């Protein structure tokens, strides 16, 4: 397959709540409808996939990972790895966190890929899949098995297999059968993974993790195709690596110390090695350079993924915050380089290996067929036991007849050869008269025998001529084969009828499903139509609501001065202007109360709004464009996690413009002058606060809606947790029920064994009593013998020894019987123990079922609660819409309220004459509040500017440090080049001196005498050696100066990294300068306004002419500023604490769910171990029961000896298999040459074989060669007599020997084809033929088939009798030939599992 570049995706996470609170700017944006990303002002990068901050997990998976899963099923290796700085969302994207406590919408890549893989497996029923899982962690450059924590790090090694793939030796691979098994292993591994808390991330990954899924797929059946070729099942093993890299860290930001600091060093070193590999592979200038895979273990593990044979996707996660600008820029640069890396994916399918597997599978089938054949023969012999002698006699007679006929044919062949030889000899050699007479008698006798054989005998039609004689055995064999094949055909017909019935049932089910699908399609269309109508209505209502909200916002922002009647000046007096009032920051995400003015209500209610559809959509598009820019400038994040709840996002997106309009234009409606004069007038206050109460009601509805949404999310988490626990409990209950069944079964076996052993105990007790009696009698006899005085001392000693032996034997027997009695009692008590354990397990199962019932009840309650919350949210949304639509109707009350205010002013104007003073007081308060707001905003801008300046100073200092280091390296490079040039000059001068000395020495050598010539020649040789060494030094120095290789490779690489770091810092400084300039320009304008306001303040305060008021006002002003600033800081801290509390609660929930999951997993593993123990106990009891408790030790010893023998056989067969695999190519090449020979014979007009039959015989050649190899290795077994007549001999020499001269011509007998063979070939063919049964005539040489003219070959008759294909017949015949040998099946002859 051709090389393809790896796919690179970039995902931008949204701003975190903490970043939003601290007003971090967004420096990374994606360009909509393109695969480009902008960082800073003008840096644009293009990638294969770009996902913005609103992207969902499903979008990332379906776009990037789903094609990789399909490639995995096809047989390719795949890899996905997440790259980026710490806290950028890598673990969240990959899905390596707490998977048990995550809702379905937020699941990462790994859970979704697992579900996709098992769905693909269920869709391929014709393929047998085996899934294995491993989970490895690279922590501090040490490998760690997360699925087997007891495995030592020293036992895990990175190696390369015979195919060049990187593997981890010693890692545990767990075979799984369902999604739940994989998720359980993933959860176990995630719980054991190293994580920690830093200042940048609460759940920071402290190691690299690699989760590998291995898929092995094998075809379930292998059948012959219609064209006669063998259809081999493919054996494919593919792997999918999910790599979660640890993020790059900076100690200044993370604040790591101690152990965390050491972890950061190791993480950064591994990522640096990975960056070097990406640079070496992705930089076209470094194509020929060495790729440093061995610098770190993570790069060694990713060798196949980067520049190897796998399909790879790299997901780069970046942070949009301006504080992470340089890290994001470096990550994007590495991702851009990675796009130049090219892999060469290869399919993990080897036809040669699969051919070997196919052959091993065929051997297995043949052995099974042989065993079934032998079983049928044994069954037939059992059913017809009375006819066995007759059948054996008939069988022996048939074998004798076949042997005699074969001998007859052999003699006949010899006679024919001798006849031809004597005919030639008669003409060539002169014989005497007596010899000629004997030869003539022999010729006449031979002719008479021929005529007698050719003449048909009366009453015997079966042997009518010479042709039928040698073929009698063939007819018998063909009849047997025909009967056997008819039985096989009948069995196949039964299978075919069953399959047809199943197919008919499936067709009927498909028809029913098609009808159901049609009905569903009709109902779906109707539902879509209704949904479309409802959506159109909702869109129209929402457009109307948005239009009204914008009108209200416009009215609130205009704030016109209204004229009112004053109390002292009559109806033409003007009311004071509305005073802007700063509202406190609300704790519920910035919702403010907005109270419109009275004139706005008049304008809104003057006429009902009527809009055309075009105007509505035009306004909607305009508002959308404005809102997009506004949202990008002032983005607000309401929760830290990525949200897949589209309804929530829509509702929040609709609320954001209104929230901001209220926060920026919040105006409190002041009371009139009369309200300041008389505060006891409740009627006027109620009328003026009518709309205020309506807005407060709207605010409370919004707060309740947010609270309900939060409750809804919590309810979803609880529901998912309960469902997960229910699934786990169901599995545990099922496993415990199976364990109870095993315990009951073990108890029953134990009871039967205990009954058996109770009888045995009584028997043993009786034997023990007898042994004791014998012992006492023997002691008495011994004492009597010692008491007697025997004259023969030798006899006495002999009798004493015999009695002592008897006593020792009796004591030993008593001890053995007592031990057996104790063992029998222990076995008898086993059933009681099993009953106790079974009762305990039943109680445990009842408890689990009770928990399941409680969970189901809780699940129903949570479902009802969720439904209620959904209804409340919808009801609140409806109420909000109604309040927004009916807001204009309340404005009709304002004229009435305004008249009431005027009446109250007119009524109160008599007693009070200081209305102007009150108005001035209101104006002063309003003015002071405005000045306070200006100063606060000014101070906030100044603080942000100071922060930006500090960040810029830090970046500049870092840049200066890098520049210093770069200048140091450049100076070193310059000094080195100067030193090299100086050395070159010195070497050149020295070379010139050496040339002069050599010339002088050569002259001296010519003129010097013979004695001095030796010394001078030695000096000349030394000078020449020095000259050559200096010449090499000068060449190396010149080469370094020419190519600029002054520094070491490490220093060159460091210089390259410094240049890149300086470039990134310059870009960050440029971005900071731009933001600082913007802030400075805004501050300049605000400073000007502030200076003008200060002059106005001074003028107004001077006009007051009261020193006390001036001092009070300044104190009040400073106090208000300090209080407001402290309040703002308090609110900021409060929100930060709330976020931390929320994060801690989420962490506690995750840990609790993980703990519960691990507890259930431990219980499950314990149950499995108990079940295995009970099965072993059953096997042990079965052995006790079968062997009656005797010979257990002997049986175990036999088993151990057998295991050792099998291990030896296994080693031998492995070696033999390797040798046969190497020698497999030779028979294939011989078969090809043999086919060419047959084709040449066919072209010559022999009529020996056609190409189709040649292909058939080539298959038989392979089987014959394999059988011969087995025989030569000394592993041949004896031939089974029951099926020896069905064997197939090898055709290697027989067919090749037959040529055009093998057929009889003009009645003469052809010479023997054995003359064409060498002596070695004859010996080998003869030995192999003797090891086989008598061959069928159709496979004999052509000379034995066509000895007379006009006789057709027997193979034509065989083809007419056969009703199956030639290939299948050949395979079955070869299977019978290869399967007759009683060779014990070993593990190597089973299909290997890789």
UniProtKB/Swiss-Prot annotation:
Pfam families: Kinesin. Residues 352-418, 493-554, 709-980, 1010-1078, 1118-1152, 1187-1226 form a coiled coil. Residues 5-341 form the Kinesin motor domain. One of its GO terms (molecular function) is ATP hydrolysis activity. Residues 551-583, 642-664, 1267-1340, 1375-1394 are annotated as: Disordered. Its main location: cytoplasm. It is found in: Cytoplasm, Cytoskeleton; Cell projection, Cilium. GO terms for cellular component: cilium; cytoplasm; extracellular region; kinesin complex; microtubule. ATP binds at residues 84-91. It comes from the Eukaryota. This is Kinesin-like protein KIF27. It comes from Rattus norvegicus.
């Amino acid at each position: 397959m051709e090389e393809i570049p790896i796919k690179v995706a970039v995902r931008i996470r949204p701003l975190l709540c903490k970043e939003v609170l601290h007003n971090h700017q967004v420096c990374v944006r994606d360009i909509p409808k393109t695969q480009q990303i902008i960082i800073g002002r003008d840096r644009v990068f293009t990638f294969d996939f770009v996902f913005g901050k609103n992207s969902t997990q499903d979008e990332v998976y379906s776009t990037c990972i789903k094609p990789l899963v399909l490639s995995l099923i096809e047989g390719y290796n795949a890899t996905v790895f997440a790259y980026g700085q710490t806290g950028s969302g890598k673990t969240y994207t990959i899905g390596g966190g707490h998977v048990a406590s995550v809702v379905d919408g937020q699941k990462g890549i790994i859970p979704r890929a697992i579900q996709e893989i098992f769905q693909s497996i269920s869709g391929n029923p014709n393929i047998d899949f085996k899934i294995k899982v491993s989970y490895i962690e690279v922590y501090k450059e040490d490998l760690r098995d997360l699925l087997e924590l007891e495995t030592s790090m020293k036992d895990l090694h990175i190696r390369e297999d015979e195919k060049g793939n990187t593997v981890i030796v010693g890692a545990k691979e767990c075979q799984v059968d369902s999604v739940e098994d994989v998720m359980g292993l993933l959860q176990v591994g995630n719980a054991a993974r190293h994580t920690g808390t830093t200042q940048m991330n609460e759940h920071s990954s402290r190691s690299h993790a690699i989760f590998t899924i291995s898929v092995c797929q094998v075809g379930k059946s292998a059948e012959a195709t219609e064209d006669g070729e063998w259809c081999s099942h493919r054996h494919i093993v593919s792997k999918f690596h999910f790599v979660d890299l640890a993020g790059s860290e900076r100690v200044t930001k993370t604040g790591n110390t101690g152990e965390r600091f050491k972890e950061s060093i190791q993480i950064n070193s591994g990522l640096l090695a990975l960056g070097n590999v990406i640079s070496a592979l992705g930089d076209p200038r470094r194509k020929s350079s060495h790729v440093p895979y061995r610098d770190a273990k993570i790069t060694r593990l990713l060798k196949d993924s980067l520049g190897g044979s796998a399909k790879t996707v790299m997901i780069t996660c970046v942070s949009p915050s301006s504080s992470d600008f340089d890290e994001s820029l470096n990550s994007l640069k590495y991702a851009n380089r990675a796009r130049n890396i090219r892999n060469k994916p290869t399919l993990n399918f080897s036809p040669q290996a699969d051919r070997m597997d196919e052959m091993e599978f065929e051997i297995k089938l043949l052995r099974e067929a042989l065993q079934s054949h032998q079983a049928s023969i044994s069954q037939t012999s059992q059913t017809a036991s009375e006819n066995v002698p007759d059948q054996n006699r008939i069988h022996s007679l048939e074998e004798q007849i076949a042997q005699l006929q074969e001998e007859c044919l052999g003699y006949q062949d010899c006679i024919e050869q001798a006849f031809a030889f004597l005919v030639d000899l008669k003409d060539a050699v002169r014989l005497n008269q007596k010899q000629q007479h004997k030869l003539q008698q022999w010729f006449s006798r031979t002719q008479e025998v021929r005529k007698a054989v050719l003449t048909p005998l009366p009453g015997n039609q079966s042997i009518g001529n010479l042709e039928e004689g040698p073929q009698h055995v063939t007819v018998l064999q063909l009849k047997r084969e025909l009967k056997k094949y008819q039985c096989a055909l009948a069995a196949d017909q039964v299978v075919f009828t069953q399959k047809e019935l199943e197919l008919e049932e499936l067709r009927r089910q498909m028809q029913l499903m098609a009808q159901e699908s049609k009905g569903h399609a009709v109902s779906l269309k109707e539902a879509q139509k209704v949904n479309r109508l409802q959506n159109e209505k909702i869109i129209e209502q929402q457009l109307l609501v948005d239009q009204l909200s914008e009108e209200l916002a416009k009215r609130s922002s205009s704030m016109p001065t209204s004229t009112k009647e004053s109390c002292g000046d009559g109806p033409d007096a003007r009311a004071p202007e509305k005073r802007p009032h700063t509202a406190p920051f609300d704790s519920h995400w910035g919702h403010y109360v907005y109270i419109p003015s009275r004139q706005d209500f008049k304008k809104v209610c003057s006429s009902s709004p009527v809009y055309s559809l075009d105007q509505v959509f035009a306004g909607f598009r305009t508002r959308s464009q404005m809102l997009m820019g506004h949202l990008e400038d002032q983005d607000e994040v309401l929760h830290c996690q990525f949200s897949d709840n589209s309804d929530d996002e829509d509702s929040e997106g609709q609320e954001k413009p209104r929230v901001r309009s209220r926060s920026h234009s919040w105006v409190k409606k002041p009371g009139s002058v009369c309200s300041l004069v008389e505060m006891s007038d409740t009627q006027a206050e109620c009328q003026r606060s009518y709309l205020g109460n309506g807005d407060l009601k709207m605010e409370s509805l919004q707060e309740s809606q947010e609270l309900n949404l939060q409750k809804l999310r919590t309810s979803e988490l609880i529901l998912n947790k309960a469902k997960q626990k229910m699934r786990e409990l169901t599995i545990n209950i099922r496993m415990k029920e199976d364990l109870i069944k095993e315990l009951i079964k073990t108890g029953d076996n134990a009871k039967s064994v205990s009954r058996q052993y109770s009888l045995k105990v009584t028997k043993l007790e009786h034997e023990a009593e007898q042994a004791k009696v014998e012992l006492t009698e023997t002691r008495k006899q011994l004492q009597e013998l010692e008491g007697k005085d025997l004259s023969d001392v030798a006899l006495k000693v002999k009798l004493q020894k015999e009695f002592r032996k008897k006593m020792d034997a009796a004591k030993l027997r008593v001890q053995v019987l007592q031990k057996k009695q104790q063992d029998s009692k222990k076995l008898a008590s086993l059933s009681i123990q099993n009953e106790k354990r079974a009762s305990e397990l039943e109680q445990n199962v009842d408890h689990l079922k009770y928990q399941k019932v409680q969970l189901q009840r809780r699940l129903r309650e949570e479902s009802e609660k969720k439904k209620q919350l959904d209804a409340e949210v919808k009801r609140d949304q409806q109420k909000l819409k109604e309040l927004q639509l009916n807001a204009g109707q309340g404005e009709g009350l304002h004229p009435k309220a305004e008249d009431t205010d005027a009446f109250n002013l007119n009524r109160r104007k008599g007693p009070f004459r200081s209305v102007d003073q009150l108005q001035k007081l209101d104006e002063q308060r309003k003015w002071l509040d405005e000045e306070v707001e200006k100063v606060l905003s000014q101070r906030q801008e100044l603080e942000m500017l100071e922060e930006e300046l500090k960040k810029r100073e830090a970046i500049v200092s870092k840049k200066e440090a890098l520049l210093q280091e770069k200048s140091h390296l450049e100076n070193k490079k310059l000094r080195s080049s100067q030193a090299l040039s100086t050395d070159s000059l010195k070497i050149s001068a020295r070379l010139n001196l050496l040339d002069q000395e050599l010339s002088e020495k050569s002259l001296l050598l010519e003129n010097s005498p013979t004695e001095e010539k030796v010394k001078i020649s030695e000096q000349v040789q030394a000078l020449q050696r020095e000259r050559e060494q200096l010449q090499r030094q000068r060449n190396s120095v010149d080469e370094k100066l020419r190519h600029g290789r002054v520094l070491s490779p490490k220093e060159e690489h460091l210089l390259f990294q410094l240049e890149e770091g300086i470039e990134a810092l310059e870009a960050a400084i440029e971005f900071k300068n731009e933001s600082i300039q913007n802030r400075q320009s805004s501050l300049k304008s605000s400073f000007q306004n502030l200076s003008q306001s200060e002059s106005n303040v001074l003028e107004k305060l001077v006009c007051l002419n009261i020193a006390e008021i001036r001092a009070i006002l300044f104190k009040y002003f400073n106090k208000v500023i300090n209080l407001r600033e402290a309040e703002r800081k308090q609110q900021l801290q409060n929100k930060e604490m709330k976020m931390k509390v929320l994060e801690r609660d989420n962490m506690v929930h995750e840990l609790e769910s993980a703990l519960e999951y691990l507890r259930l997993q431990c219980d499950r593993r314990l149950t499995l171990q108990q079940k295995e123990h009970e099965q072993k106990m059953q096997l042990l009891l079965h052995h006790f029961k079968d062997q009656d408790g005797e010979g257990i030790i002997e049986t175990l010893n036999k088993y151990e000896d057998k295991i050792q023998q099998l291990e030896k056989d296994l080693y031998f067969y492995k070696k033999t298999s390797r040798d046969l695999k190497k020698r497999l190519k030779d028979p294939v090449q011989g078969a090809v040459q043999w086919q060419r020979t047959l084709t040449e014979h066919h072209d010559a007009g022999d009529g020996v074989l056609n190409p189709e039959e040649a292909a058939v015989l080539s298959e038989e050649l392979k089987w014959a060669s394999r059988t011969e190899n087995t025989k030569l290795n000394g592993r041949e077994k004896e031939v089974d007599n029951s099926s020896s007549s069905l064997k197939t001999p090898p055709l290697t020499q027989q067919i090749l020997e037959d040529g055009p001269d093998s057929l009889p011509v003009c009645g003469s007998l052809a010479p023997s084809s054995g003359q064409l063979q060498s002596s070695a070939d004859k010996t080998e063919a003869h030995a192999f033929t003797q090891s086989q049964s008598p061959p069928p005539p159709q496979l004999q040489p052509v000379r034995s088939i066509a000895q007379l003219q006009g006789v057709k070959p027997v193979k034509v008759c065989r083809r007419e009798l056969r009703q199956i294909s030639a290939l299948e017949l050949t395979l079955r015949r070869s299977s019978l030939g290869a399967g007759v040998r009683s060779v014990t099946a070993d593990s190597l002859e089973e299909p290997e599992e890789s």
